[in-house]
Amino acid sequence: MIRVIQPPLIASKQLFRRYLATGGTFTNKTSQLDRATLTIKDGPVFSGYSFGANKNISGEAVFTTSLVGYPESMTDPSYKGQILCFTQPLIGNYGVPSSTLKDEFNLLKHMESPSVQCIGIVVADVALEYSHWTAVESLQQWCQRSGVAAISGVDTRQLVSYLREKGSSLAKITIGEEYDADEDAAFEDPGSVNLVHKVSTKAPFHISCPEKYAKGLHIAVLDCGAKENILRCLVERGASLTVFPYNYPIDKIANKFDGIFISNGPGDPTHCSSTTENLAKTMEKYHDLPIFGICLGHQLLALASGARTIKMKYGNRAHNIPALDLTTGKCHITSQNHGYSVDAETLDSDWEPYFTNLNDLSNEGMKHKSRPIFSTQFHPEAKGGPLDTAFLFDKFFENIEQYRATNGLNLGNVDDSLLVDILPKGRVL
């Protein structure tokens, strides 16, 4: 028998205070919203209210325990195809900032990609009214404008308890007054397709470094779904970037750059076999070339070196996960968003673990024992989250400077065959 869990009459202390302050008049606007249902495949059914796009959707239900940063999370390409549940009870209270405003590097100032990447969101209580000096619209308006399904009034504590016990599950959000268990909308598994292909640039593009930051460095970026703040962290340290599609044969031109960076991204890393093959060739041909990978980039680098990746039960998605630096013994608080991890037991003898998750003891990084190559499962750039490990970008740049000094070459300018001057200046979708 399927149990339908009804939304609470008053979903939060905030609404209860409002209820008392108005003399017992319930002033929340959820009564004006359409009813909606969140259905977990082979699991519970939650009834709530729709405040997003008026459409039915299906995807993988995951959760984040991050307290803030919902605009950044929702535009993170790593969430492509997923239904994101926020454990923070009240979401939307500071609204949504501009999704088009750019900074001095021509990168989005507030968002991590040009569009919302998750297919739907689940919250306990949505703030339909907002207050913040950077906000230009409400979360409701943004979801509706972006075509994102959104449901509020859900018992997110019970939902997260289920996902922690059973693991990340397929789910769907349907709009309508009555739940129909025989509804023909199928449960679609986003993990069955190559999600990286959907979020990666379709052609190379170039990001110039402003003169006041420039150090004459040029880094090649493999775009598996790169967050804007990752690109910003590279440019603000003095490098121009040429960003390539995830499956670009980087081994053929890697020696034209000062370093290679492999970005974050969504889904199963084994779907990117061409990327791992190209990385393996690159490491075989250029022994001293600095390489740095983050999140999916970490997993792809591990696969390229002969290690194995595994799907986690429910993944790690939060801004407060402790990671132990096995080199220094220091513990850092990190921002994470991933459903797969590297099996440290399968690392080749030339590699060693770099960081370990102190919550579940999963691998959080690796490094080569004799070459300037390392990677992390967590996000040193955060956005949102702590910046405890931002020093890893500095480490990457130190490796680059040493590489240039050792080779005695000025590698900062790529040859004319790449036609950097005429490359697009933004991601080609």
From Swiss-Prot:
Every Glutamine amidotransferase type-1 domain range: 218-406
Superkingdom to which the source organism belongs: Eukaryota
Stored InterPro entries: Anth_synth/Amidotransfase, CarbamoylP_synth_ssu, CarbamoylP_synth_ssu_N, CarbP_synth_ssu_N_sf, Class_I_gatase-like, CPSase_GATase1, GATASE
Keyword annotations from UniProtKB, A to Z: Amino-acid biosynthesis, Arginine biosynthesis, ATP-binding, Glutamine amidotransferase, Ligase, Mitochondrion, Nucleotide-binding, Transit peptide
Active site as annotated: 295 (nucleophile), 379, 381
GO molecular function, one term: ATP binding
SUPFAM superfamilies: Carbamoyl phosphate synthetase, small subunit N-terminal domain, Class I glutamine amidotransferase-like
Catalytic activity: hydrogencarbonate + L-glutamine + 2 ATP + H2O = carbamoyl phosphate + L-glutamate + 2 ADP + phosphate + 2 H(+)
EC numbers on record: 6.3.5.5
Family matches, as HAMAP family: CPSase_S_chain
Entry function: Small subunit of the arginine-specific carbamoyl phosphate synthase (CPSase). CPSase catalyzes the formation of carbamoyl phosphate from the ammonia moiety of glutamine, carbonate, and phosphate donated by ATP, the first step of the arginine biosynthetic pathway. The small subunit (glutamine amidotransferase) binds and cleaves glutamine to supply the large subunit with the substrate ammonia.
Known partners and oligomeric status: Heterodimer composed of 2 chains; the small (or glutamine) chain promotes the hydrolysis of glutamine to ammonia, which is used by the large (or ammonia) chain to synthesize carbamoyl phosphate.
Family: Belongs to the CarA family.
Protein name listed in UniProt: Carbamoyl phosphate synthase arginine-specific small chain
Organism, as annotated: Debaryomyces hansenii (strain ATCC 36239 / CBS 767 / BCRC 21394 / JCM 1990 / NBRC 0083 / IGC 2968) (Yeast)
Gene name per UniProt: CPA1
